[in-house]
């Protein structure tokens, strides 16, 4: 019987809208909005209750090492930075791994540049097809020449589809971006290699501009010669 009772069509009870006199106060809160707001309120209320309970049971003499190894910034605990976390040898090993990763990136980019350049070079320097014509007299030669000129003019750059033009322009932009990326990576690799060499033992000094034979914007160092055993 319950299924029959539920099958009877009933009037849909709609929630009332905001009265005309209170339209200036905005939309009237619906029941589903009230449920969301009430859940959020009770959740915050429960969190505050638990925090108050923790504070009431707190031992004033308790101590954790995190109390001296961290500090609060805007009410949030932040761990203090460790000054000498790694030794010199460990730092050297980490930098060597980073240099290997950068070198791998340079080699990968150079391969992509080579592949892209060869593809664009083939598009720009496409060899024309050869066709041999046989003519009986001068008039026929002139006619064939005019026909070839018309055909070559119709196959010019203006008749290339715009889709192909856009794709070629995009490939040239990609090639230029990859070349710039390789330059940046090579500069970064050179800087890291220099810093690694400067960390090694041995007396060294930075050369002045008048001592450098090949002028460069980068710093140049000279190591003192050591006698090999």
Curated annotation (Swiss-Prot):
InterPro entries: SSU_processome_Utp11. Signal peptide: none annotated. It comes from the Eukaryota. Pfam families: Utp11 (PF03998). It is found in: Nucleus, Nucleolus. Keywords: Nucleus, rRNA processing. GO terms for biological process: megagametogenesis; rRNA processing. Its main location: nucleus. GO terms for cellular component: nucleolus; small-subunit processome. Residues 1-23, 199-229 are annotated as: Disordered. PANTHER family: U3 SMALL NUCLEOLAR RNA-ASSOCIATED PROTEIN 11, U3 SMALL NUCLEOLAR RNA-ASSOCIATED PROTEIN 11-RELATED. Belongs to the UTP11 family. Component of the ribosomal small subunit (SSU) processome. Involved in nucleolar processing of pre-18S ribosomal RNA. This is Probable U3 small nucleolar RNA-associated protein 11. The lineage of its organism: Eukaryota, Viridiplantae, Streptophyta, Embryophyta, Tracheophyta.
């Amino acid at each position: 019987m319950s299924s029959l009772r539920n099958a009877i069509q009933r009037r849909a009870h709609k929630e009332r809208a905001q009265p005309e006199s209170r339209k200036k106060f905005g939309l009237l809160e619906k029941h589903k909005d009230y449920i969301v707001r009430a859940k959020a309120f009770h959740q915050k209320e429960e969190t505050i209750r638990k925090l108050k309970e923790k504070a009431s049971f707190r031992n004033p003499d308790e101590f954790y090492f995190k109390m001296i190894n961290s500090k609060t910034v805007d009410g949030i605990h932040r761990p203090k930075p460790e000054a000498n976390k790694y030794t010199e040898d460990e730092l050297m090993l980490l930098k060597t791994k980073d240099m290997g990763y950068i070198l791998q990136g340079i080699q990968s980019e150079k391969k992509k540049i080579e592949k892209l350049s060869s593809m664009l070079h083939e598009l720009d320097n496409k060899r024309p097809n050869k066709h041999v014509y046989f003519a009986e007299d001068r008039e026929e030669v002139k006619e064939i020449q005019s026909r070839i000129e018309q055909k070559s003019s119709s196959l010019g750059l203006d008749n290339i589809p715009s889709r192909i033009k856009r794709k070629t322009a995009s490939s040239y932009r990609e090639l230029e971006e990859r070349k710039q990326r390789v330059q940046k990576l090579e500069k970064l690799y050179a800087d890291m290699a220099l810093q690694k060499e400067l960390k090694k033992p041995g007396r060294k000094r930075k050369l002045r501009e008048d001592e450098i034979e090949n002028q460069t914007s980068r710093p140049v160092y000279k190591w003192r010669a050591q006698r090999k055993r």
